[in-house]
Every structure is written in C-alpha cells, then in structure tokens.
Amino acid sequence: MRWSALPLYRSSRPLNKVSRDYQNVTSVTEQVMSIRNRSNLLVYYTGDEPDGHQDPPSAPASAAVLINSLDPYRPSSLCLNCQDYLFNDYVFGTPILMPDVYPTGINPNFSVVYNTPCTTEQGCCGCDNCVGVFEDIRNRMAEFSMRLEVLGWDRNTTLWNVPQGFGSAEYVNSSYRLRAATDADLNSSDTA
C-alpha cells in the first residue's frame, strides 16, 4: 500500500498533503482494514521519501508498528530519498528498505527545482551524490547494504530496488529530470 497513491485518486487534496497520510493513525487504520484481506497484497508501503520531506524520523516505524498490529501477516516497507540523512533513525525497525534513486536524465550539479547548486553537503538534484548514470542505483544499493551490515540490521532488513524512469513530458519538465529515461540508459553503463 502506498499512502500517496491510494487516496490520490479519490481526493482533490494536493499530493504533498496526501502523501503524509501515513502519519495519521485513523487514515492508516482505515486503509489497512479496507485491504488487509486481499489475497494479492504483498507489502505495505509506509513512507514515501520521509527523509526528503523531513518527516519525523520515528514516523515510518510508528506506521509500521500500527500496520503490523492490524495485519501481522505482511511486512511494511520504507522508501528513502536521501543518501545519508538520518539513515539510522529512519531505517530502524524497517523490514524492507527501498532506496529511491533516479539517476537518468538529471543534472547532478544543479537543482532546476530549487535553483541551487548540489554538492555533497547540500542541495537536492533528485539523486543525492549521483553522477547521473545507471550505476548510481547499484552503488546506492551496495552502500545501503553495507550500512545495514555495520548496524547489525542486515538480517532483519531486506533491500528492494525501485529504479524508475519517467516518460511524461509534464513530469520531466517540472522536476529534476531534464529528459525521460531512454533504452540506452537501461542498456549502457556509461550513459549520462
């Protein structure tokens, strides 16, 4: 369950308001109760990039505990946006961690959204400290795997990859993407 997707199609509220629903106990309870008996439900998707939105670090874990109390048969997952913003705090207790890496079609040095430079210390270019190649996904997965091992959480937290490409001109032109992903991005290791 992705808290930003389910209500988005049933509501006229802005996405940023809807996507924070995972912090609302009543909303989470209603949504879990409405779908928990489905045989095709694999996993609950708690927070969509809570680190990038600076949600309270305890919010994803609180949602996961609530979800597990309502449906103990399915795990919850968490999708992180940032490379290293309060990683330990956000990931604590997460059964499935999904790094959200969008390397293709970005400008890794300058944010067109915020009109600011992106460095290792600051800035949001859509992919923290990426160079704009498909290997950024592999590198982030390896880095998160190593962090989980160092923390001793590698046996309790599974990594799932969520590479994404966007073809909508509306999305590409209004976000961090300078262009949509191409076949070459998927087939070449050196495409920027």
Regions found by a protein language model. Name each.
Residues 1-192:
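Glycan-processing catalytic domains of CAZymes
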